[in-house]
Amino acid sequence: VTSGGTESILLAMKTYRDWARAEKGIRRPNMVVAETAHAAFDKAAQYFKIKKITVPVDSNFRLGLASLKRVVNRNTIVVVGSTPSFPHGAIDPIAEISEFAFQNKIGCHVDACLGGFVLPWARKLGYPVPDIDFRLRGVTSMSADTHKYGYAAKGTSVVLYRGEQLRHFQYYTVGDWPGGLYLSPTFAGSRPGALSATCWAAML
């Protein structure tokens, strides 16, 4: 549980940077996003020194898959899809994006901060909602805001990973501090428990 969608996105991008450095030796990482991706990805790029490669959207305001394939290179650590994008409410082609990422052994983050708690129920109502989650083998992480259509209190979101191996790189630890072991799963060290508790209650 994070403080909001921006922190969920920042944590995910920091995770990919550290994963790529440790597992692939990438020192000059880049991420590929559509021009409609949330501004938090710009913030992550600046904070964590990740080059942000922006690709245009197509006539339906969805990430252009051909453009994405042209710019991905050996330093690409993650490609990003939005479900939906904030500017236009368009769902990027997650199935195609994630499969391309899987074939190229890079991460695929789905920003479902806006639609994460809408699209599953829209599908149940009969709307043609495509798969956007871990049912797709190439999706490696997701962000979804509980404080939007999850109706939790303002100030909560979640970031999810396909497995523990990737999630491990989100954590910050210091083992040689005279004060003892320090470990933090998010950016804040001390956090109020009330928001997490009310989020849990809303989910029930």
Spans of features found by a protein language model:
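Conserved beta-loop-alpha segment that forms the PLP phosphate-binding cup at the N-terminus of a helix
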Residues: 1-25, 40-44
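Substrate-binding/gating loop at the entrance of the active-site cleft, primarily
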Residues: 32-49
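Active-site-proximal loop/turn and secondary-structure-junction residues that shape catalytic pockets
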Residues: 37, 85, 114-116, 148
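Active-site nucleophile and cofactor-binding loops and adjacent substrate-binding regions
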Residues: 1-6, 33-35, 82
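Active-site phosphate-binding strand-loop segment of PLP-dependent enzymes
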Residues: 63-112
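Short acidic, glycine/serine/threonine-rich loops at helix termini
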Residues: 11-14, 42-47, 90-93, 118-125, ...
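Active-site C-terminal subdomain of aminotransferase-like
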Residues: 124-204
